[in-house]
């Protein structure tokens, strides 16, 4: 799905675990763009990536501007534009780790769309990875034009399953689970799903 020289857009980079894999796959001739709005995560992301990666200090959605962004202070694993998602995940993290406090705080972040970022940066991504903790549908709605030329995506689907599948099927994508099994057109699985043309 990702070849040497490709351009990858990673939406939700956290601290760069997956970004490093993308760097290896695209090689020295490829490009990786990673959107990460959280200052704490971005600090470590910058330390973990190489010179062929461009860090975009923004969130991606279906609008441009400035929005509230919710951060759980356990490790930043469930930071999101969707407050309910972060609050629910924060409670689960608190219980699973026997922590007495897992705070959720709200910050303001710059927001843009994939279509506008692709145009501004002059890129045509071959592959897009979306891991945005409940905001997947909004990100995809902001990528209507870009999706026409994308070869493949990996979307971690947390909610809005049916709408996400319908949007991507309209764009002629097929869906596979991470184990490689093709999904039937009526099957709307969650988790990490690969879409390809």
Question: Which stretches of residues belong to each language-model region?
Answer:
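Phosphate/nucleotide-binding beta-alpha loop and adjacent structural elements of enzyme active sites
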Residues: 1-197
């Amino acid at each position: 799905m990702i070849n040497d020289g490709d351009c990858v857009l990673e939406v939700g980079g956290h601290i760069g675990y997956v970004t490093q894999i993308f760097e290896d796959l695209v090689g020295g001739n490829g490009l990786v763009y990673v959107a990460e709005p959280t200052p704490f995560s971005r600090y470590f992301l910058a330390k973990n990536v190489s010179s062929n990666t461009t860090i975009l200090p923004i969130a991606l959605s279906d609008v441009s501007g400035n929005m509230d962004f919710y951060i759980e202070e356990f490790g930043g694993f469930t930071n999101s534009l969707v407050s309910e998602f972060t609050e629910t995940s924060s409670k689960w993290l608190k219980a699973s780790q026997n922590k007495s406090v897992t705070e959720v705080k709200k910050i303001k972040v710059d927001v843009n769309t994939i279509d506008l970022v692709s145009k501004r940066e002059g890129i045509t991504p071959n592959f897009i990875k979306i891991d945005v903790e409940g905001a997947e549908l909004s990100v995809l709605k902001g990528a209507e034009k870009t999706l026409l030329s994308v070869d493949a995506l990996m979307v971690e689907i947390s909610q809005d399953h049916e709408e996400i599948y319908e949007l991507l099927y309209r764009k002629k994508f097929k869906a596979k689970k991470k184990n490689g099994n093709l999904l039937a057109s009526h099957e709307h699985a969650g988790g990490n799903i690969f879409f390809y043309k």
